[in-house]
Structure formats: structure tokens, C-alpha cells
Amino acid sequence: MAHKKGVGSSRNGRDSNPKYLGVKIFGGQAIEAGNIIVRQRGTQFHPGSGVGLGRDHTLFALVDGKVEFSVKGAKKRRTVSVVSVEA
């Protein structure tokens, strides 16, 4: 006979923290250099002029200006550019 009561164990009970992905600055909005435009997994959006690509595929502004989203090329790639606004 068992001297301890058998205790079942659940294989659930885990959850990952939210990653807060998505577009942070939308088309037509003003942005400063260094600000994040899109947080993404993989390149759903590709960097255009004035936009850098981070190690985790984050798109960020390299210059001050306005954000512009467009679809380019035969592959219909969605690109993000920052157009500098002349004062």
C-alpha cells in the first residue's frame, strides 16, 4: 500500500509575456530619428528610405520626418519610409 497520497501534476500552467508587436507610428504621422515605427516578427514590413532594420526586425526612423507606407515591386512588398519635411 502507498503511504503517501499520489498527487497528479498538470502539464499546463505556463504562459509567455505579451510582446506588444505591431505598428507604433502610422502613415502621415511625424516621427523623430530613433523612434520605433513597427515591431514585428520577420519582415512583414520592409525598410525604405530613412528607415533602419533592427536585429529583431524592428523598423525605426533614421531621420526626422513623416512616415509613409507603400507597396512596391512585383512581390508587392510593404515598405515603410520616412520622408523628411522641409521647415
Curated annotation (Swiss-Prot):
Biological-process GO terms, alphabetical: translation
Q: What InterPro entries does its record include?
A: Ribosomal_bL27, Ribosomal_bL27_CS
Q: Which domain of life is it from?
A: Bacteria
> Keyword Transferase: yes or no?
no
Quote one Gene Ontology molecular function term: structural constituent of ribosome
| Family annotation (Gene3D superfamilies) | 2.40.50.100
Q: Name one GO cellular component term.
A: cytosolic large ribosomal subunit
> Quick one: signal sequence residues?
none
Per UniProt, which keywords does this protein have? Answer: Ribonucleoprotein, Ribosomal protein
Q: Which family does it belong to?
A: Belongs to the bacterial ribosomal protein bL27 family.
What's this protein's name?
A: Large ribosomal subunit protein bL27
The species is Stenotrophomonas maltophilia (strain R551-3)
Give the gene that encodes this protein: rpmA
